[in-house]
């Protein structure tokens, strides 16, 4: 009798653990697993009244290399053969 009670408890615990691990959280604009689609992100930004989607500026190669100049000096100091 003790073995059957123990088995029932184990099955119930297994079922509860399986339910918690397999359940998904759903909220407005979110896909299962906490992922967002690009369209939903755009809709959320518009919903927040930011005036639309903010475009990131494209960096020119000169500006980019200028930003990396301190790192280039460090690399030349520590790796003179390159």
Swiss-Prot record:
Function in brief: Stimulates the secretion of gonadotropins.
State its location(s): Secreted
State the name under which the record lists this protein. Progonadoliberin-3
Glycine amide occurs at: 33
Q: Name one GO molecular function term.
A: gonadotropin hormone-releasing hormone activity
Q: Which residues carry this modification: Pyrrolidone carboxylic acid?
A: 24
The family annotation for this protein states: Belongs to the GnRH family.
* Lineage of producing organism: Eukaryota, Metazoa, Chordata, Craniata, Vertebrata
From which residue to which does the signal peptide run? 1-23
The record, for PANTHER family, names: GONADOLIBERIN (PTHR10522), PROGONADOLIBERIN-2 (PTHR10522:SF6)
Entry's Gene Ontology cellular component terms: extracellular space
Q: Which domain of life is it from?
A: Eukaryota
InterPro entries noted in UniProt: GnRH (IPR002012), Gonadoliberin (IPR019792)
Keywords for the protein's UniProt record, in alphabetical order: Amidation, Cleavage on pair of basic residues, Hormone, Pyrrolidone carboxylic acid, Secreted, Signal
């Amino acid at each position: 009798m003790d073995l059957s009670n123990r088995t029932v408890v184990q099955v119930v615990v297994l079922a509860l653990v399986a339910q918690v691990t397999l359940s998904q959280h759903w909220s407005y604009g979110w896909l299962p697993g906490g992922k967002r689609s690009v369209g939903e992100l755009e809709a959320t930004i518009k919903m927040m009244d930011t005036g639309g989607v903010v475009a990131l500026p494209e960096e020119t190669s000169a500006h980019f290399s200028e930003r990396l100049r301190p790192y280039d000096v460090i690399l030349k100091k520590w790796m003179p053969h390159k």
